[in-house]
Swiss-Prot record:
Pfam family for this entry, one: Arrestin_C
Organism for this UniProt entry: Dictyostelium discoideum (Social amoeba)
Record's compositionally biased regions (Basic and acidic residues): 547-562
Comp. bias intervals (Acidic residues): 128-137
GO biological process, one term: protein transport
Coiled coil: 320-374, 544-577
Protein name in the entry: Arrestin domain-containing protein F
GO CC aspect terms: cytoplasm
Length: 1030
């Protein structure tokens, strides 16, 4: 026999947690065997855990007197569970298990245990109990009477306990019992069976046949019942096996529940009874005895409702979801940690590179000390360490690239999408600017004539052309980022930076390729072009009060102008696409007047296509937007705007705006009139490299390709000038630029079979383990690179001077000039003689001037002024209107334009743009040609610098060599003779005489640029900066 140790977990709960009932309340318990038992709160027990005298009402505070010769078993400190019965009660054999105070339990098998006093066999079903309490002495008497009864099996059980405590040998988990104690146990079991049989016959218990009634009860016993399954554990004779498994029913709640179909109420709440053990002199280690209850077999578990089944399924699903979420989070954390480690590695690589560069810079700065052996050794050590670092970095990068190939390919697609989205956004912004113009036109929709509908059609053409220009420029900018994958470096080297017209230009091309490229060769093109831009600013006049006579005169002029506009022939000069506008400062005074429209028709006009809302040097965006909003929101805008019929389809471009329109500008209440012309003087091209010998493939690696071409002798010198006239509010840009460009010839991409011979080509190179999708993506990407290579060009500018400049420098031909002046009133004259050793000079050079003055008159010369004057002649062509010749003119314009793709430094032409040139300080003349063109020659004269010297008295002479310093001149341009631009220089010597005309001598000279390599792109750089200033 084994004693099983069991720990009571709920021994510490308070008995006061039992719900209270009123004093005097009674509760009667009944179950199938007609047992009656009552229990009282705060009941104390002996060392065996049993009180035979007192009784406690379940759920109540008051005690109830118990019937004589009744035995009530009250165990200690365990809660109870309720047991439901839904079948007829039948006598059956039960196995009892009781727990000792030493946390050990005894299993009594092969018997039905029953302890009841012989005097307590007949208990009536309807016995009543009165409230009240009994003394402790009565309890002791009852206990002694029951213990003295030899026929009572309780005494035998107690004796067995003492024997077990004295004779058993305990191990860690089990105890062994002697054979004597086993025999005693068997005898007590037989006695208990006899009592059990007698009890059934004497009490005449009537078993109920209705098995559907449900009786639930709970007894506050520290009782653990093993109940065997009747269906599965019976032998052939009907007896149950003792060694097979049993159901365990634990009764550990200190309250009783009786639930019937009529009233289903829970009479008490779960709690525990904790009672301290009371040791006695006789029995120090006595185990707790349990009252035997004859219980029916446990019913089969009822089927679980579908609701609870679903809840269980939901719980399982939620658990799986939580586990999946935890796994996903762990995976994301691991990925994040890997990315963080990768970033740290990259940062370490960058820091190593920076340290390496710093070390090299330190060594390069100490070139004077490299002769020492110690420094050489240190340099070698540093270089070795740096090489090791570079090798380590390369290994790390290779590993990272191998791990992240798939990610990089996906990123390439993402970057392409982002680029396309940016292009779409730029197009939308440009369309917004166009819509602003269309809103102005729609305001006057009621007054627009048929000629204005022609304006809308032309505007659509301008918009489409400009959007094409924007897309092409964005593609060229993005191409440089992607072409780096094919081309490592490319550079054009010229033998000199300064060439003379009629001389050969020599140089070479250095190009290193990362991959093989299938091309037929390389082409070289060079050209010379002239570009002229004139911007005229005119501040609008504020409105003045007019007399009646002036108003009448203005009305007559308006009528004449209206008649002239109606009678204009088709051969009239093309006008700007413009609308009439007044100053925004006068809007308040004229906004409510009704006749202001007629009085403003002769106001100055502005080019609507050249209207710009972007920032400019002369003004700010806020001012411009305010003026535009006032015009747009004014109720009488039809009185301020008048759309003129448009006859041209050209548009201008500028670099001061992010959009593809040149849209200029309210700048500090100024209107801009712009005219520009661009012309190609000479261009040629030839192939410098061919790949016929190599099967049409240019292999990867470094290639050095020499080239040369001849410059014609009649070409003008390089030139770049930018001037601002404050008096006339004009900005003039003029430039003559030489450029060469090299591009690939006949780029082809053809997919070939993946043979062993062709696998060396870059478009067939791939790993054997690579997926088909990756190979397709790679080929598509290479196709896009090939398309970019077709338009890819590398450009370089160079400087050219006219042969006359070099000839004058070599020959040094002197020049002399003499001027004489006489006076009407005074006798005598003044003679001025000037001599120069040579006529060619360069910037920042002192010019020696030999001057002789003979003053034979009675007048004195106050002072002598020497200055350098620049004379610049600009010719512009105005194309006449002719509907039949529009297509021919456009073809001629396309020929004059650059054949290259649009570049940042190249501006598109405005073939039919008019000009507004002031005649206040400049002279202009027009010449008619047979091609229906009107050439306008504009002469611009500016003084670069001047110096003042002492004068000569009357009847005196002066002879000396004066050194004229040119250091004060910020920049000189070469003397040039182009088709649109001509620039010359004169040295002007003036003798100032009071109350008389001055004696003036003008000597033409030549200015050139120094032949240095640094001047290869100086004119092109100035040209680009001047474009931004325009």
């Amino acid at each position: 026999m084994e004693i099983i140790k069991e720990n009571n977990e709920n021994d510490g709960e308070n008995i006061n947690n039992i719900p209270k009932k009123k004093s005097g309340s009674k509760r009667q318990l009944s179950f199938k065997k007609k047992w009656k038992a009552s229990f009282k709160k705060n009941d104390f027990v002996n060392s065996h855990g049993i009180n035979y005298n007192k009784s406690v009402g379940v759920g109540g505070n008051s005690g109830m007197p118990q019937r004589r010769n009744s035995i009530v078993a009250k165990p200690i400190g365990l809660t109870s569970y309720k047991i439901n019965h839904n079948h007829n009660y039948q006598s059956q054999k039960l196995t009892w298990k009781y727990t000792s105070p030493t946390n050990s339990s005894l299993n009594l098998k092969n018997s039905d245990l029953k302890y009841l006093n012989n005097e307590n066999k007949n208990i009536s079903d309807n016995s009543n109990f009165d409230d009240g309490e009994e003394d402790d002495t009565d309890n002791k008497k009852n206990i002694n009477n029951k213990n003295n009864n030899n026929n009572n099996p309780l005494t035998d059980i107690i004796n067995i306990e003492e024997k077990i405590a004295n004779t058993t040998t305990t191990t860690t988990n089990t105890t062994t019992i002697n054979t004597e104690t086993k025999n005693d146990i068997d005898t007590t079991i037989s006695k208990l069976n006899n009592f059990y049989d007698n009890d059934e016959t004497n009490n005449n218990i009537q078993n109920e046949t209705d098995g559907n009634n449900n009786n639930s009860f709970s007894i506050s016993n520290n009782l653990i019942i093993k109940e065997k399954n009747n269906n599965n554990n019976k032998n052939d004779n009907g007896d149950s096996d003792d060694d097979e498994d049993c159901k365990i029913i634990i009764l550990d709640k200190p309250h009783i529940e009786n639930l019937n179909d009529k009233n289903k109420q829970i009479l008490s709440q779960p709690h525990t009874l904790t009672q301290p053990l009371t040791p006695t002199s006789n029995n120090t280690h006595k185990s707790t005895l349990f009252k035997k209850l004859e219980l029916p077999p446990a019913p089969p578990s009822p089927p679980q409702p579908p609701v609870f089944q679903n809840l269980n399924n939901c719980d399982n699903i939620i658990q799986h979801q939580l586990e999946n979420n935890c796994d996903a989070k762990n995976k994301s954390i691991n990925i994040y940690n890997n990315e963080f480690d990768f970033k740290n590695n990259n940062n370490n690589i960058i820091e190593n590179n920076e340290n390496f560069e710093k070390n090299l810079n330190l060594l390069n700065n100490n070139n004077n000390f490299y002769h020492n052996n110690n420094l050489k050794k240190s340099k070698d050590n540093i270089l070795k360490k740096s090489n090791n670092n570079i090798n380590n970095i390369n290994n790390i990068n290779i590993n990272n690239n191998n791990n992240n190939n798939k990610k990089s390919k996906s990123k390439i697609k993402i970057f392409k999408k982002l680029l396309n989205n940016n292009i779409d956004r730029l197009n939308k912004n440009n369309m917004d600017n166009v819509l602003m113009k269309s809103q102005i036109i729609q305001i006057n929709g009621a007054e627009i004539d048929d000629g204005n509908n022609y304006f809308n059609k032309n505007d659509q053409q301008h918009i489409e052309d400009n959007l094409m220009f924007l897309n092409e420029t964005s593609q060229t900018n993005n191409a440089t980022c992607e072409i780096d994958n094919l081309i490592d470096s490319i550079k054009i080297n010229l033998s000199n930076g300064y060439f003379i017209a009629g001389q050969k230009v020599t140089g070479n091309l250095e190009i290193s390729l990362n991959q093989d490229i299938k091309t037929s060769g390389l082409n070289l093109k060079w050209k010379v072009f002239e570009h002229v831009i004139i911007n005229h600013y005119q501040s609008p006049q504020s409105p003045q009060k007019l007399n009646k006579k002036d108003k009448e005169k203005e009305k007559e002029k308006e009528k004449e102008n209206d008649n002239d506009n109606e009678n204009n022939n088709s051969e009239s000069l093309i006008r700007d696409q413009s609308f009439e506008l007044i100053d925004a400062s006068s809007l308040k005074s004229f906004s409510n007047s009704s006749n202001c429209g007629s009085s403003l028709r002769n106001s100055q006009s502005i080019n609507l296509n050249n209207y710009n809302f972007n920032n400019y040097k002369g003004g700010t965006l806020k001012k411009n937007s305010k003026i535009f909003n006032v015009l747009k929101n004014s109720s009488s805008i039809t009185n301020f705007l008048k759309i003129n019929p448009l006859t041209s389809s050209s548009s201008d471009f500028s670099l001061n705006s992010s959009s593809n329109y040149n849209l200029n500008l309210f700048n500090e209440n100024r209107l801009i009139y712009k005219n520009q012309e661009k012309k190609t003087i000479y261009e040629s091209g030839d192939s410098i490299f061919q790949t016929d010998d190599n099967g049409g493939i240019m292999n990867s690696g470094l290639h050095i390709i020499p080239f040369s071409f001849l410059l014609p002798s009649h070409l003008p010198s390089s030139f770049s000038d930018f001037t601002i006239d404050k008096e006339t509010n004009e900005k003039i840009l003029s430039a003559i630029i030489y450029k060469l460009s090299i591009s690939f010839q006949d780029i082809l991409y053809e997919e070939e079979d993946n043979d062993e011979n062709n696998n060396n080509n870059f478009y067939n190179q791939h790993d054997d383990n690579e997926d088909n999708e990756n190979i397709r993506n790679k080929k598509e990407y290479l196709k896009s690179l090939y398309e970019l290579l077709k338009d890819y060009k590398i450009k370089k500018s160079f400087t050219v001077c006219e042969p006359s400049i070099i000839a004058a420098k070599v020959n040094e031909i002197p020049i002399r000039m003499e001027k004489k002046k006489s006076f009407l009133v005074n006798s005598g004259q003044i003679s001025l003689k000037v001599a120069l050793k040579r006529t060619i000079f360069f910037a920042n050079e002192k010019i020696p001037i030999n001057i002789k003055i003979e003053n034979a008159s009675s007048r004195s010369i106050d002072y002598i002024l020497i200055s350098i004057k620049k004379i610049q002649n600009i010719s512009l062509s105005l194309i006449k209107k002719s509907k039949n010749n529009n297509e021919k003119q456009q073809q001629q314009i396309e020929k004059d334009n650059d054949e290259q793709q649009p570049n940042i430094t190249d501006l598109t032409l405005s073939p039919s743009s008019s000009s507004f040139l002031s005649n206040s300080s400049n002279t202009s003349s027009s010449k008619n040609n047979n091609n229906n063109n009107n050439n306008l020659i504009f002469k611009k004269c500016t003084f670069k610098t001047s110096q003042r010297f002492n004068g000569v008295d009357a009847h005196c002479n002066f002879s000396d060599t004066i050194l004229f310093d040119t250091n004060e001149i910020k920049g000189f341009n070469q003397t040039t003779n182009g088709t649109l631009i001509k620039c010359h220089y004169n040295i002007v010597i003036q003798c100032f005489v009071k109350r008389a005309f001055n004696v003036v001598c003008r000597i033409p000279i030549l200015f050139g640029a120094l032949p240095e390599n640094n001047l290869t792109s100086i004119f092109n750089d100035e040209y680009q900066l001047n474009l931004l200033n325009m």
